[in-house]
């Protein structure tokens, strides 16, 4: 069963700085995660949106997701979060595609 990891980011204090690091550094790291099938980044719209960006990472199975996120590439991606986000500004969720 296909699964995802979703990262929801709150509005950053400095959009330009956030986006520069996110798209130039973080997403290239994400794309190196073993087993990753696809990554999509969406920007929320509307003035009352609860989040700023959402990243959806797709994997073929829970096992591939776990292995990918536990890999050195997955750990490097996780370690990079502190370079553009605070712990309270990102929410992580895991889903199964139905």
Can you say where each PLM-predicted feature lies in the sequence?
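Macromolecular interaction modules
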Residues: 1-98
């Amino acid at each position: 069963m296909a699964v995802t990891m979703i990262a929801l980011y709150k509005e950053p204090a400095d959009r330009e700085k956030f986006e520069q690091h996110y798209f130039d550094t973080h997403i290239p790291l994400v794309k190196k995660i073993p087993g990753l099938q696809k990554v999509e980044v969406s920007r929320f719209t509307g003035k009352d949106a609860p989040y700023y960006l959402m990243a959806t990472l797709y994997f073929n199975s829970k096992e591939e997701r776990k292995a990918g996120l536990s890999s050195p590439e997955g750990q490097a991606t996780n370690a990079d979060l502190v370079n553009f986000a605070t712990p309270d500004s990102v929410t992580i969720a895991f889903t199964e595609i139905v």
